[in-house]
Amino acid sequence: LRVAAAFVTALALLPSQAQQARLDEVKATAEEAYLYGFPMIVGYDVMNKFFIDRDSGQFKAPINTLSNEARVFTPKDTAISTPNSDTPYSMAMLDLRAEPMVLCMPVIEKARYYDVQLIDLYTNNFGYIGSRATGNGAGCYLVSGPEWQGEKPPGIAKSFRSETQLGLVIYRTQLFNPADMDNVKKIQAGYKLQPLSTFLGKPAPPAAPAINWPKLTPEMFTTGFAEYLDFLLQFAPPTGTAAVEKPMRDKFAAIGIGADRKAPPKTPPSPEVKAALGEGVKEAFAKIGATAEGVGTTVNGWQIGSAAGSREFYKGNWALRAAAAKLGIYGNSEAEAVYPFTRSDASGIVLDGSK
C-alpha cells in the first residue's frame, strides 16, 4: 500500500489527540474510497478472469476480441453472480487507448430481443445498442475512449464515448427455447468487433503500452483494495464528465490512491494507520450491504428495482453503485431490464444454493 512517508511520519510526531484526528481522517477517506472503488475492483476481478488470465478456468477471449457463447450460464459460471439464463452472452473487454473500436450488428428479426450494453471501468452504463435503443436493423457503432478527438466517420450510425480507457461490452441475444440455439449462433456470428483503423481500411496507429496486470488476491477486497484502485484509476482520468470527481479523488492520495505512479515506493503504513484503513473498509462494506437491502420495493416477498445505470442515474451515490456490484455486477439500466431479488421462500426460509 502506497502511503506517503511524510504522512506516516507526521502521525508519529503529533500529540495523541491530533494523531487520533488524523487516524479518523484516514478511516473516513478509506471508507469513501472503498465505496467509490468497490465496483471497479469487482469489475477487475471479472475482467481478469474473462479476458486477462488465460489460466483462470473462465477465460473467454483476448482484449478487443468478441467472445460468443451459444449456451446458457450454469452455477459453474461464478465470475458474475447473477447472469441471465435466456439470453446467451457475447462479451468483449475494450482497450480504447490506441484507437476506438467499431461494433457492427446484423439484421435481427423484429420478434427477437437483443441488447448491447456499453460499460465503463466505473461500471456506469454509458450507452446501449439493440432492440429498445437503436432497433433491430443492421448498423455499425463507434466506441471511443475519453481522449479521442476524431470525427464520426462515414458508415457509423452513432458514436459513444467512454469516460475510461478500459471498458466492457455485453451482448444479450434472446433464446426462445432450447431448439432455438442454432438461430442464436447465426446471429452471434454476425456480430463484428474491430478497431477503427481496420473498419476504415487504414494502417493501425502505434500500439498502447503493455499493461502489467496485478494478480487477483483475497486482499483486493479488504485492506489491499487501495493498490488495486490506484492501479485502475490510471485508466479513468478525471476529465470531461468525470471532472466533478477530481476534488474527492485528490483526497484519496492521503492513503496512496492516485498519487504519482512514477514516484519511488512509499513507506508502509504504521499498524495504527493500517487499522484505521481496515475500519474504513469495514464501515464501507456494511454500508454497501445496507444499501443493497434497500434497493427497489418489496412486492410479495420479491425485492423489485434496479441499482444499475449511468452516471446521471447515480448522481454521485457511490453506495448505490457499489450495491449494484454486490447484487449483480454489470446489470442493465432500468429502461432495459428490471431485476427481482429474494433471499427466502414463501415460508420465510432463507434460500441455500448448496441444497
Predicted regions and their residues:
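Bacterial N-terminal signal peptides
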Residues: R2-A12
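A compositional/structural signature for long, glycine/proline-rich flexible linkers
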Residues: Q19-K355
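Sec/Tat signal peptide C-region and signal peptidase I cleavage site
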Residues: L14-A18
